[in-house]
Each structure stands twice: as C-alpha cells, then as structure tokens.
Amino acid sequence: MYKIVRKKELNAAVTYMEIEAPFVARKAKAGQFIIFRVDEKSERVPLTIAGYDREKGTVAIIFQKVGLSTEMLGSLNEGDYIQDFVGPLGKPTDVEGKKRVCVVGGGVGCAIAYPSAKAFKEAGVETDVIVGFRNKDIVILEDEFKQACDHLYLMTDDGSYGEHGFVTVKLQQLLESGIQYDEVLAIGPIPMMKFVSKTTEPFGVKTVVSLNPIMVDGTGMCGGCRVTVGGEVKFACVDGPDFDGHKVDYDELMSRNSVYREREAEERKTHICRNQKMGEELIK
C-alpha cells in the first residue's frame, strides 16, 4: 500500500498528488512513468512522473479526472492509501549532448513537460518552454516553469492570459527568428504533438514526442501500448514513451486511444452519481 502524503487541486479537473514510494523515488528520472491501481478491483492506469524527492521518498503525479480510476483516485485525500504504485517504467528523457532545446507542453501534458524542462535546465541546457491552455482558468505550474527554464512563453487559445494563439504559433515564430534548437520536445494532446512535429519538420529540427497510449502491464507483454513509428511497431512502455515525432503514425494512435473514451466517461459518471446518491441517503 502507498500513502498519499500531499494533495492539491491545480484546477477544477486536474489534481496534484505526492505518493510515498521510496523505491520508485530512488530510481525515477524525468520522462518515466508509473502504473497505479486504487484498489484490488481497479484497472491499471499509467501516469507520467511529474516529480520526485529522493530524500523524502515521494513521487509526484498530476492527473485529470477523465474516467472511473482517475475519479476514484481524485476522491482520496492525504493520509489515504492506494493499492499499487509500480515504477519507474519506460526510458527517461535524454538530456545529454544538447546546447539549446524547446519544450512544448499542452494542457495537462504540461505536468509531464515540467520535469523534462527542469532536467534539461539542471543539465546546463539552455531551455525554452512553450505551454498552452484553452483559457486562463486551467493554467497550471506557471511559477514552477519559470524556475525550470530560461524563457517561458505562455499561450491561451482565447487570449485570456499570456499570448493569444496555439503553441505552434509561438514555435513557428521562434524557429523563423533563427534560433537553432538541438531538439524540440512536445508533450500533450496527440493533435498538438502532431502539429508541433509538422511545424518543426521544414526546419529540420529533431522533434521528440512523449506518448501515452492504452497500456496494461507496462512491460511490453500485453501489446496494448503498441504504436507505429517509421513503419515499425514499437511498444511505448519499453521502447518509449519518447519517440521521433516526425515518424509517429498519429492517425492510428488517435484511433486506438479513443476506443474506450466513451466508456471511461460513462463509468466516471456512474461513479459520481452513485456517490451522490449514497451521500443523500446518509443525510436522510
């Protein structure tokens, strides 16, 4: 069992948690992920590590409540326990041998972009960060990003905060200004990563995307996390989660990732309704 030692709501749908997991914290690196189960009957859900403290033995996760398991996890509080917390899994983000990079994060994907940006900065790499959100109300980790990079560009789709436009607008501007990036790392919704890769391709800039496909065991045995990269089948849990953004088959990835979306939403809705009904019964 793994204890929740800290919980913070970052916005209405996104939650930050620190889990007491000393063995995971000891080995964790930016870009890797864990798999959790809330209880014995729960599904196994992968989440990218959002931070870690080796001295305290804690691992941070940031998640959006989209299905039953994340809704159940979000209903727990500090001092509660979860059944499983396995990791670190996957290959860490490669921060070596680079002079300047640009990390691009979208929405809740910024939770994953943050530790990678921090790792680049700590490795002595000049780090630009572009983060994008739909509006001001869902902006997360702004102060943390300011400490983890050399230049931060915050974009909102509606212009309610930061600069108006998508992350690709700012990326295009930076590339056209003549900045020479050794790498662009994109983390977020699949369409965003796809268009970031399309933006960088004419400039010949190496682009890496962090993928989070459907996953079950996290060891490559189930095949659920398979993705097509450069015409070859790869497994995100062992070959990734970072891949060459110019070679990923995004259309296939989007199709596979959407298979259970409606069911996840329905399960979450049922769970919320059940809890509300139980609360009403207790009040009576």
Language-model segments: what does each one mean?
Residues 71-214:
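FNR/FR-type flavoprotein reductase catalytic core
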Residues 1-78:
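Ferredoxin-reductase
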Residues 36, 84-85, 227:
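A generic structural signal for residues embedded in beta-strands
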Residues 6, 51, 154-156, 209, ...:
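Structural signal for conserved beta-strand scaffold positions within catalytic alpha/beta enzyme cores
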Residues 42-51, 89-99, 237:
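Short, Lys/Arg- and Gly-enriched loop/turn segments at beta-strand edges
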Residues 235-239, 243-284:
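Short Fe-S-cluster ligation motifs
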Residues 112, 190-191, 212-242, 271-275:
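Local cysteine-cluster metal-coordination motifs and their immediate loop/turn environment
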